[in-house]
Amino acid sequence: MVKWKIVFTKQSLKDAKLISAAGLRQRAEKILAVLEKNPFQNPPPYEKLIGDLYGAYSRRINIQHRVICQIYDDLKIVKIIRMWTHYE
């Protein structure tokens, strides 16, 4: 099985600090591990986003926060856009 490469935006790296401070690091790491193996694995469930984030996918960390990513299937890359709320 091919491992997917995870890349982070500057914003997602800032969000990682907030996630850690909020005590959600372990949950976020589980989601990142799933994305590294197979970003289309279900569960945990994911949603395709619309609007400003059209083409991106969302996975729930908790009721408020999400991991938002873009998936480049041909390159086997998962780009993490946000790891905090995307409702702001």
Regions found by a protein language model. Give the residues of each.
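A short, surface-exposed loop/turn module that caps and links secondary-structure elements
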Residues: A33-R59
